[in-house]
Amino acid sequence: LSFLNSRLNVSGDAYVRNTTDMLVPGKTLPAVYGAASPQQNAGDLRTKGYELVVSWKDQFDLKGKPFNYGVSFVLGDAVSEITRYDNPNKLLANHYEGKRFGEIWGYRIDGFFKTDEEAANWKIDQKLVNTQIQKAPGEWGHLRAGDLKFRDLNGDGVISPGKKTADDPGDMEIIGNSEPRYNYGLNLNASWNGFDVSAFFQGIGRRDWYPSANADKFWGPYSRPYFSFTPKNFNDLVWTPENPDAYFPLLRG
């Protein structure tokens, strides 16, 4: 669509893309098998998305010479869903039919324990998610003020992953999505008297991230220098009795 003597242009597309027979890992095998599942063409994916482009171009005289300029903005988004995968039990360790690509499953937190007494009298069993705490010696082997309170979503009094399936995830739920959303770009250009200049900016509106084992190393585990990556303001972000509204829980060794 063009407006204002073709100076303003708007275009858009919406699409549905079906990807069939994707090469994916086979069904999870028992550990006693001693090998990974072979890859096979056994997955289908449906992607729904759109793209919108708005542009403006014009010119005017500057010191007797034409000054041309243009601005364009692009916005796009897409969501993908697994439509076929050999995982009838919907194990969370694999893809499953109906799964939105990039799902992040995890536990919800209800803040920190305010006092040692509250932690000691906590009725919800958190042993499965507090294995590192239980390994600590002495009083540090128990919940204390500043430790995390996990949310008991299924109300059974025990924090657990259930059967680790989409139908029985225990106290886990979808807490985010790692796929980028709302991709956008801005292009600026201008020309005058034989000179040209242009600039391009791009980004995404949203993307959730969950740290993996080496996620604190920006360049990955095999390119990192071996020194501390602790942020400069880390002490201000850790829970203490004087800082009960901290971002991080109680610091443990």
Indicate where each model-derived feature is located:
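Transmembrane beta-strands of outer-membrane beta-barrel proteins
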Residues: L8-V10, Y69-V71, L186, W192, ...
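Outer membrane beta-barrel strand-and-loop segments of large Gram-negative receptors
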Residues: S11-D58, R108, D147-F150, G157, ...
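Transmembrane beta-strands of outer-membrane beta-barrel pores
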Residues: A14-T20, D58, L75-E81, W192-G194, ...
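Outer-membrane beta-barrel proteins
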Residues: T19-P25, K63-K65, V79-D86, R206-S212, ...
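Flexible, surface-exposed loop regions and adjacent strand-edge segments
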Residues: G26-A35, D86-Y96, N214-R224
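Conserved small-residue
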Residues: Q40, Q59-G176, F218, S228-F248, ...
